[in-house]
């Protein structure tokens, strides 16, 4: 098909059409991209982004995790556990920084997956993130009233409107406080991004000040008492180095939240500069606070004597500072409020991005003309989260939050590899330009066998190309269809595509085998070997070939570029897959039900209403020419 990207096959029917729809990809938003009507307000700068990142990341978990992880895993080496977890989270942050600056549009990991991988994977990521933010926001809201009760001297001291109540005859405990707070935060978010971010900044500042008080006052007590927590016969690693790493895997989830910054990319004044800085500063500040609090608390009291529920408060109480308990509890409440804002902020933007692409009803894509935020999507998000928070104790579902985040982290790292080695070089054009496309095709001396170019259902790029057949997975064009790629370039892209596939499969096999301790050695060790070999082969191959020249110009050029590619994204993929396979079968069973619902919604609504359903794919080199011809004809 000449310059047109076409892998039309005879036969296959509807089943083949379903497969093709899964791999169609959209372009990075540009001047030629589709108009979205009213736009989001570009009002955010670096301080706003840091406030969003820190507020969404530092929840009340730090006030609890310190005691739990120190008692069960790391002991006095807790600060090192936080450091290792922070470095692991930083790998994902590097990947987010590059993609958010190159593709600065709402939707975060969903948006990047749609551009680099395909519609099917993007839908799964977006659907999983919807679950993550809904349950995450509800769980955070349910945790506020117990902390408020500590300030009021117990649950009996809480006003009736804030206290929990059990419905007579039913095993349901309603939480009015949680629902009220969700509605308050929803109202703030509807007022505008700048107003809601200002409020989050204030709440986050109070939380950070409380943590700084813990660090300063705790250090004073530590030097005064001689740091008894470090003078133990069990040493610095009472559970061994393995315990320290086990602690790192647990506290890694305390760093989840910085990805909320990427969801606001469309509202940042200078995304190419500010997004990488905002993500990096937020993660650095969170890691520093976590480590300093850990150093102080495990030094004030022996790790085995820590209260697993209120480790910081009990540590100060043991040194006759009962009044500090109220201040620390206030910090925990502020942390929960900030985390609630961080959970409810990204979801409307993901709903908006999916609705823009036609995968969800268009009502979610409406942007209020005055406040310049997706008010309808925000209200829908708030209603769902408030209902769950009011009626359900979602603490048992908290593990499902991690699935969405880790899937997003993994896909962002894979997207960086794709962008660097096999970036998409086709663009979807509206079918209204079919006549102009045919005209340019004729001028270029191209001929087609059918007289019309394929639509998106028949036009995508295959990952692996040989002389006999096309394996239809997106990423790479075949040379016959292009007629302009030399063999060496085609070979490079084929090798890169295979290598990325080997890397992902190897990381999964290695993670699964290493985590399956119940497997017989005859199965487990060979599986580890196969996975390790595939992973290493992919890494060596990607390190040995050149990256694609388009990596400098793909998307919005001039932004941040992730260092140490391909090593850094591959390590990121391995870490996230290891954490995913260790979430437990019960968590995966619950998530599978949600994903199955998502598949049904996509098959019966999203696939048919996708904005790419009737798109025509052409190579980037000819897309601009087609647009110029079209604009010239309108002049």
UniProtKB/Swiss-Prot annotation:
Chief location: membrane
Gene Ontology CC: plant-type vacuole; plant-type vacuole membrane
Bilayer disposition of the protein: Multi-pass membrane protein
Subcellular compartments: Vacuole membrane
Record has DNA repair as a keyword: no
TM annotation in the entry: 49-69, 77-97, 109-131, 172-192, 201-221, 236-256, 281-301, 325-345, 377-397, 399-419, 494-514, 525-545, 561-581, 586-606
Tissue expression from the record: Expressed in roots, stems, flowers, leaves, and siliques.
Highest taxon, organism lineage: Eukaryota
Topological domains annotated Vacuolar: 70-76, 132-171, 222-235, 302-324, 398, 515-524, 582-585
InterPro entries: AA/rel_permease1, CAT_C
Single annotated GO MF: transmembrane transporter activity
Keywords: Amino-acid transport, Membrane, Transmembrane, Transmembrane helix, Transport, Vacuole
Pfam short name (any one): AA_permease_C
Keyword match Acyltransferase: no
Parts of the chain on the Cytoplasmic side: 1-48, 98-108, 193-200, 257-280, 346-376, 420-493, 546-560, 607-635
GO process annotations (BP): amino acid transport; intracellular amino acid homeostasis
Family according to the record: Belongs to the amino acid-polyamine-organocation (APC) superfamily. Cationic amino acid transporter (CAT) (TC 2.A.3.3) family.
Function: Permease involved in the transport of the cationic amino acids.
Protein name per its UniProtKB record: Cationic amino acid transporter 2, vacuolar
Organism of origin: Arabidopsis thaliana (Mouse-ear cress)
Lineage: Eukaryota, Viridiplantae, Streptophyta, Embryophyta, Tracheophyta
């Amino acid at each position: 098909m000449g310059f047109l990207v076409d892998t039309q096959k005879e036969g296959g029917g509807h089943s083949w059409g379903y497969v093709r729809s899964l791999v169609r990809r959209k372009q990075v938003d540009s001047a030629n991209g589709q108009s979205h009507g009213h736009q989001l307000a570009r009002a955010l700068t670096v301080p706003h982004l840091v406030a969003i990142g820190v507020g969404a990341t530092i929840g009340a978990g730090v006030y609890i995790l310190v005691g739990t992880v120190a008692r069960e895993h790391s002991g006095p080496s807790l600060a090192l556990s936080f450091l290792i977890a922070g470095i692991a989270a930083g790998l994902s942050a590097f990947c987010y920084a590059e993609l958010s600056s190159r593709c600065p549009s709402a939707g975060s990991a969903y948006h990047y997956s749609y551009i680099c991988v395909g519609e099917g994977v993007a839908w799964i990521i977006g659907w999983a993130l919807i679950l993550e933010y809904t349950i995450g926001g509800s769980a955070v809201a349910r945790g506020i009233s117990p902390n408020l009760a500590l300030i009021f001297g117990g649950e009996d001291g809480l006003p009736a409107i804030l206290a929990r109540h059990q419905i007579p005859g039913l095993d349901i405990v309603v939480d009015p406080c949680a629902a009220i707070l969700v509605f308050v935060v929803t109202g703030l978010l509807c007022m505008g991004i700048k107003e809601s971010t200002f409020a989050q900044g204030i709440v986050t500042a109070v939380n950070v000040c409380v943590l700084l008080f813990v660090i300063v006052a705790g250090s004073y007590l530590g030097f005064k008492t001689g740091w008894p927590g470090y003078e133990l016969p069990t040493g610095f690693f009472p559970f061994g180095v393995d315990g320290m790493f086990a602690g790192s895997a647990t506290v890694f989830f305390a760093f989840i939240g910085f990805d909320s910054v990427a969801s606001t990319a469309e509202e940042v004044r200078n995304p190419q500069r500010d997004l990488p800085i905002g993500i990096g500063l937020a993660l650095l500040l969170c890691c520093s606070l976590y480590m300093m609090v850990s150093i102080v608390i495990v030094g004030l009291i022996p790790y085995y004597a820590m209260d697993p529920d209120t480790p910081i408060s009990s540590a100060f109480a043991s040194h006759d500072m009962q009044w500090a308990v109220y201040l620390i509890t206030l910090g925990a409440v502020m942390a929960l409020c900030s985390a609630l804002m961080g959970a409810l902020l990204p979801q409307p933007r993901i709903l908006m991005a999916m609705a823009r692409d036609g995968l969800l009803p268009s009502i979610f894509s409406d942007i209020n003309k005055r406040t310049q935020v997706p008010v309808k999507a925000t209200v829908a998000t708030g209603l769902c989260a408030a209902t769950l928070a009011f009626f359900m104790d979602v603490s048992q579902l908290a593990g499902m939050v991690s699935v969405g985040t880790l899937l997003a982290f993994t896909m962002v790292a894979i997207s960086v590899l794709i962008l660097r080695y096999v970036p998409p070089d086709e663009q979807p054009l509206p079918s209204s330009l079919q006549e102009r496309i045919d005209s340019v095709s004729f001028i270029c001396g191209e001929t087609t066998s059918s007289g019309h170019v394929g639509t998106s259902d028949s036009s995508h790029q295959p990952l692996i190309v040989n002389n006999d057949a096309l394996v239809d997975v997106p990423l790479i064009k075949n040379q016959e269809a292009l007629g302009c790629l030399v063999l060496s370039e085609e070979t490079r892209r084929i090798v890169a595509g295979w290598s990325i596939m080997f890397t992902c499969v190897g990381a999964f096999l290695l993670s699964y085998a290493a985590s399956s301790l119940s497997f017989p050695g005859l199965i487990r060790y060979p599986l580890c070997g196969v996975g390790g070999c595939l992973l290493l082969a992919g890494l060596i191959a990607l390190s040995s070939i050149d990256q694609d020249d388009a990596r400098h110009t793909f998307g919005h050029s001039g932004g941040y570029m992730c260092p140490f590619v391909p090593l850094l994204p591959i390590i990121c993929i391995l870490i996230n897959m290891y954490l995913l396979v260790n979430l437990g079968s019960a968590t995966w069973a619950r998530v599978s039900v949600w994903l199955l619902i998502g598949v049904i919604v996509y098959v019966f609504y999203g696939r048919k209403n996708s904005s790419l359903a009737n798109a025509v794919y052409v190579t980037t080199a000819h897309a601009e020419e087609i647009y110029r011809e079209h604009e010239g004809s309108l002049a």
